[in-house]
Amino acid sequence: MELCRVLLLIFSAAGPALCYEHETRLVDDLFREYSKVVRPVENHRDAVVVTVGLQLIQLINVDEVNQIVTTNVRLKQQWTDINLKWNPDDYGGVKQIRIPSDDIWRPDLVLYNNADGDFAIVKYTKVLLEHTGKITWTPPAIFKSYCEIIVTYFPFDQQNCSMKLGTWTYDGTMVVINPESDRPDLSNFMESGEWVMKDYRGWKHWVYYACCPDTPYLDITYHFLMQRLPLYFIVNVIIPCLLFSFLTGFVFYLPTDSGEKMTLSISVLLSLTVFLLVIVELIPSTSSAVPLIGKYMLFTMVFVIASIIITVIVINTHHRSPSTHTMPPWVRKIFIDTIPNIMFFSTMKRPSRDKPDKKIFAEDIDISEISGKQGPVPVNFYSPLTKNPDVKNAIEGIKYIAETMKSDQESSNAADEWKFVAMVLDHLLLVIFMLVCIIGTLAVFAGRLIELNQQG
């Protein structure tokens, strides 16, 4: 029994040792006269065929200002090296090995539209080498590719970005690159919280440059159509701006007599200014175009400032008096006679339109109270009775009081008319500002939202 255990241990330890010996001998034989600077072809006129596949893992960042898209990818490359073939039976049945990528010839694929200066693919990974000479190399890479970011419809925008891959020194007669598929592999793609992939495709291009008009250079360009998820900007930017606009409209619902109209207007303006300073970093700072959200914020700012200016006019109208302003007939006709009837302002108390009698006293006055006699005693204003100094002074005093009361009544009626005009303006502007707020919001965003809905 003990002998069996000893033999079992010996054979189990010998297995890995034999495998290591076979792989070591295989590697020594393969690379004894191998040169990694020579293309693996039998005839120098032959081309090495390289199959390229792009696997997109993660969309890391989209920099709208610098127009750089950062992605995490795996670049799968397959080709056949005729100098690295072997018979598995000669090496203990070893059919594949993994060797450092620096030890073999590799196609010098680079990202043409790289934006950070590092054009090469990561080298510090191993390749899978099969006994047929087929090599599979899938290095990971962080690509920073240039992409023309169009912010016109931000945050309801779509961006069409690309990655252009090709060999740096080999033309199409020396190395032929073929796409593994017309679409990149997104089987391991991790969804972004800001972007969603709408479409993605790859195309192979034959390019002839001016320096070499007879020699083609090949590249594979992958295009990605990305659509931004706007929920974050709707909740944190658009809805607050909309609420500021509605609050601005309600300034005209506040009674002018309260004295708080300007306080509320200035408070809204200051709050909006602070809010814009906080969120300005969320908006792409580029001068190529004004984004939708920038237009809406500008609309909101103009909306608030316009309300302040109009509020000043309304307050000025409310406090006008006949001693400073005379109401033009057209103002009376429009704001007292016409608009209240059109807008159904039935709850408004209109100013008195009764015209006081121009005569303070008739020529015949009743002086029964003065004479002490019962019943009316018609007395001519110029009768001898009225020539009595005491009576005359009393009548003059009464006339002065009556004229003063008439003047005060006229002033009060005129002031009431101005206040009524201001009240009509408030009601009218409340309706107008609410409509402008809704229509302005729809005018800025509705067209783009309808377009995106039609695109599906």
From Swiss-Prot:
PROSITE patterns: NEUROTR_ION_CHANNEL. It catalyses: K(+)(in) = K(+)(out); Na(+)(in) = Na(+)(out). GO terms for biological process: acetylcholine receptor signaling pathway; membrane depolarization; monoatomic ion transmembrane transport; neuromuscular synaptic transmission; response to nicotine; synaptic transmission, cholinergic. The chain crosses the membrane at residues 230-254, 262-280, 296-315, 428-446. InterPro entries: Neur_chan_lig-bd, Neur_chan_lig-bd_sf, Neur_channel, Neuro-gated_channel_TM_sf, Neuro_actylchol_rec, Neurotrans-gated_channel_TM, Neurotransmitter_ion_chnl_CS, Nicotinic_acetylcholine_rcpt. Residues 1-20 form the signal peptide. Belongs to the ligand-gated ion channel (TC 1.A.9) family. Acetylcholine receptor (TC 1.A.9.1) subfamily. Alpha-1/CHRNA1 sub-subfamily. This is Acetylcholine receptor subunit alpha.
